[in-house]
């Protein structure tokens, strides 16, 4: 996998005229997670294939004139796909003509679409589920939805906070962003981040099927998520928000959530090699 870059890194590499700045700033302001994500080019036209080590070889103590068994590690391959997100802005040319600063007016209209795209990507990072919708990529919620597994399994990284279905349940995720850990991905030979294309003046169609002239902008993003090392994510699931946020919540109840987060963080290794963030 290629070296992963943040959106701010990409800002420095694209559009010397600064036209990309306003897009990136809007994305980051609408969802801070988009500033944390490292984006890397996948090794497939549709995403990325990662080889994960899921077992270590045994180590033996050797005696003089005696050998040891041959050992080996075990691995598995995981394929992560990118999805295709698109949206179009169409602003009536007559409406634009009324604005004192036409370009600024059109940009302000477009930024609503930029913010919506950012929210969609951030949502999929946690809640995407390809089993329910093949067009989505799997988010952290579906990848870490079980607990109690063996070490090196994703389920081992999950701590159960003990909440039940009676109240509103939530989760907390600790993500270690990094080249060899967790990254956002885009297709091989593709582009990172949101692409905004000015389509110029086109025929738009109203609700009755009638045409009018409009200035159109196409927004496109092909994001995905790759968890190269499952131990670079930890989660606390089934947090009872009613018990924690309620006025009657006890110190012990709040402390239990903090203790669960500390336990979860303890299951991540080499935190100094990644950019860890709680969500």
Where are these regions (language model features)?
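N-terminal low-complexity, intrinsically disordered segments
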Residues: 45-76
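Core alpha/beta structural scaffold of self-assembling particle/tube/pore-forming proteins
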Residues: 2-35, 71-279
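Short, low-complexity, charged/polar segments at coil/turn and helix-coil boundaries
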Residues: 34-43, 52
């Amino acid at each position: 996998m290629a070296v992963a870059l943040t959106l701010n890194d990409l800002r420095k590499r694209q559009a010397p005229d600064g036209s990309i700045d306003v897009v990136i700033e809007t994305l980051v302001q609408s969802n801070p997670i988009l500033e944390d994500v490292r984006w890397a080019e996948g090794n497939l036209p549709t995403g990325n294939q990662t080889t994960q080590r899921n077992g270590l070889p045994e180590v033996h103590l050797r005696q003089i004139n005696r050998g040891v068994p041959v050992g080996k590690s075990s691995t598995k391959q995981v394929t992560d796909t990118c999805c295709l997100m698109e949206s179009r802005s169409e602003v009536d040319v007559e409406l634009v003509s009324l604005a004192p600063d036409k370009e600024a007016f059109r940009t302000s209209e477009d930024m609503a679409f930029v913010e919506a795209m950012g929210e969609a990507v951030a949502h999929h990072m946690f809640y995407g589920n390809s089993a329910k919708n093949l067009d989505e990529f799997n988010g952290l919620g579906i990848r870490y939805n079980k607990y109690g597994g063996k070490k090196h399994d994703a389920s081992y990284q999950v701590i159960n906070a003990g909440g039940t279905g009676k109240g509103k349940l939530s989760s907390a995720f600790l993500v270690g962003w990094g080249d060899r850990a967790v990254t956002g991905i885009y297709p091989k030979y593709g582009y990172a981040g949101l692409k905004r294309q000015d389509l110029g003046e086109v025929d738009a169609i109203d609700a009755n099927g009638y045409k009018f002239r409009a200035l159109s902008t196409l927004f496109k993003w092909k994001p995905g998520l790759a968890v190269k090392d499952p131990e670079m994510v930890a989660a606390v699931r089934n947090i009872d928000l009613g018990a924690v946020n309620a006025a009657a919540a006890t110190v012990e109840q709040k402390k239990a959530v903090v203790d669960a987060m500390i336990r979860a963080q303890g299951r991540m290794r080499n935190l100094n090699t990644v950019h860890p963030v709680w969500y």
